[in-house]
Amino acid sequence: MPSYIVVGGQWGDEGKGSLIAYLALKDEPQIIARGGVGTNAGHSVFINGRKYAVRQLPTGFMQTKARLLVGAGVLVDPGVFFHELEHLKEFNVAERVGIDYRCAIIEPRHKERDRASSYLHDKIGTTGSGCGPANADRVMRMAKQAKDIKELEPYLTDVAQEINDALDEGKLVLIEGTQGFGLSLYYGTYPYVTSKDTTASAIASDVGIGPTRVDDVIVVFKSFPTRVGEGPFPTEMSAEEAERLGLVEYGTVTGRRRRVGWFDFEFARYSARLNGATMLAITMLDKYDKGAFGVTDYDKLPRKAKEFIEEIEERVGIPVGIIKTGPELEHVIDRRDTL
């Protein structure tokens, strides 16, 4: 599959980071590109027991053979960008990364407006990263672009051209989405959403490829969906129930405790349809069934875990190709060859 997109099927925090890291190392794509909103979404991955979190750069950074790209649709915060270059120095990221020269820039004034808005802070639950105000300025054609920032000059490129050239040459391209379907400005739980669309079609547009150039769309769901901030959550459980089940989590960017719910099959089916899913990935199966922890062979899954996967496939109507059974990169069941 020359190109594939990975997107979240719920409200973000589905575990896309660890899945993308696995795909980056397993499949060895020549290009790993990030779409999405900007620095309001964090992806975490564990490598040899150490946690790495990124908000700006592609999560597949550990694949040292890959070119890392940030698409034109993504907002760039220069401070975050350079911090991550330093944080990931051991992976030689600075020599492999390219930012599209058309990316809009998050400035300090955008973060100030974001944090000063009682509506965004109290009602919507903004992360305060400045993405909403920056996108508003972009729509009004007032935002600066990456090409206007001198410090970014060494990293500027035409991401769309690079990716399309790579596809013409038969190279493998992995494209990362951020956040999740339920936070889409168009299809999510408006107004409790992010500042742009988050579906696979939007992510393709972010990096500059047309729909006919996308070969596969992997939509990621976790066994117990979570949500940070305000907004409807039909299957939400009480905080006490989440604690009893050992499902206490905190947001990568905000540090706020995540709300937790039961798996919503109807929502998952709708999300998969609108994203054009060709395959599903299920993460944190070990939270649903502790006996699944670390299992790497589907046939060795406990009965409860296997029945859950089968129910998802039946009710959502899309095959489950990848299953994460723990936080480490090797905690995965890869069924893609059997589909």
Swiss-Prot record:
Pfam families (alphabetical) = Adenylsucc_synt
Q: List the catalysed reactions.
A: IMP + L-aspartate + GTP = N(6)-(1,2-dicarboxyethyl)-AMP + GDP + phosphate + 2 H(+)
Q: What is its EC number?
A: 6.3.4.4
Necessary cofactors: Mg(2+)
Pathway-wise, it operates in: Purine metabolism; AMP biosynthesis via de novo pathway; AMP from IMP: step 1/2
Top-rank EC class of the record's enzyme: ligase
Q: How is the cofactor bound?
A: Binds 1 Mg(2+) ion per subunit.
| Key words of the record | Cytoplasm, GTP-binding, Ligase, Magnesium, Metal-binding, Nucleotide-binding, Purine biosynthesis
Q: Where in the cell is it found?
A: Cytoplasm
Residues reported in the UniProt entry to bind GTP: 12-18, 42-44, 258, 284-286, 324-326
Tell me the function of this protein.
Plays an important role in the de novo pathway of purine nucleotide biosynthesis. Catalyzes the first committed step in the biosynthesis of AMP from IMP.
Q: Tell me the subunit arrangement.
A: Homodimer.
Family assignment? Belongs to the adenylosuccinate synthetase family.
Q: What is this protein called?
A: Adenylosuccinate synthetase
Q: Which organism is it from?
A: Thermococcus onnurineus (strain NA1)
